[in-house]
Amino acid sequence: PTDKAYNVNRAFEAGWGGVMWKTLGEAGLPLVNVSGPRYGAWHGTDPTLMGFNNMELITDRDLEINLAEIIQVKKDWPDRGVVVSLMVPCEEQAWKDILMRVEDTGADGIELNFGCPHGMSERGMGAAVGQVPEYVEMVAAWCKQYSDLATIVKLTPNITDIRTSARGAVRGGADAVSLINTINSVMGVDLEQMKMSPSVGQQGSHGGYCGPAVKPIALHMLSEIAGDDECKGIPISGIGGVSNWRDAAEFMALGASNVQVCTAVMTHGFRIVEDMIDGLS
């Protein structure tokens, strides 16, 4: 929902206080995303959406276009928060280069995407970094060395103990952590075609699971970090199945400073924030 200025403007017009700009990558030819069905859904006994699966990658829009739009959005909405999600190879120079470009936009902060479980982890990014606390610490330290922007580390739930990665973020000097990213999953199997679903070009794949069904997992992991002595005091951004103000309040009750919402916005629209504002007031 926050992949371009058009959608970010809609979010701010609806009343959202800030956005997480869809993950940017390195300069050069844009990444080629999946062409075809990128999503799968899990419904309960009625049409209510319980879980949502995606195998989408990071932005497939040119870096220069994204950066120019971020500059304009900050000019148009100086009182709103714009944090830019980033994912580049686990190389110091790659991070140094992207940090300089993002800092020039006037963005309020960066979120290090160490959680994506599909497509990018096979390239040594995303969850491949987030599952190794030493890598989390190393990249967070690079970001604090080369940028003055507030640095948030987004954590993967696809790990035995999420506290180990959170501790790495703290040691690296991160200003905050966010969790959870999506959970590695296979949405189902098309028994007629004997392929995982969703499938594109006769090929299926695992993807990232989110939506209301993951909220209990997210709450547990958040509470683990909030109660950890080595992570004491670090701000936490809660993610995972937040659909209404009660969900948001539950995350905050367990230690979140704020919450992020994606799936519910995709399914119900930006104006769901109105109920959240009323309820939390």
Region locations from a protein language model:
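Alpha/beta enzyme core
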Residues: V8-A14, G18, K75, P89-S237, ...
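Glycine-rich, proline-tolerant flexible connector loops at the mouths of alpha/beta enzymes
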Residues: K22-R61, F114-Q131, I183-G188, S205-H206, ...
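Short, glycine/acidic-rich beta->alpha junctions
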Residues: T2-D3, A94, D161, S243, ...
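C-terminal flanking segment of RING-like E3 ligase catalytic modules
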Residues: D275-M276, S281
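N-terminal capping/small domains of soluble enzymes
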Residues: P1-V83, M87-E92, M276
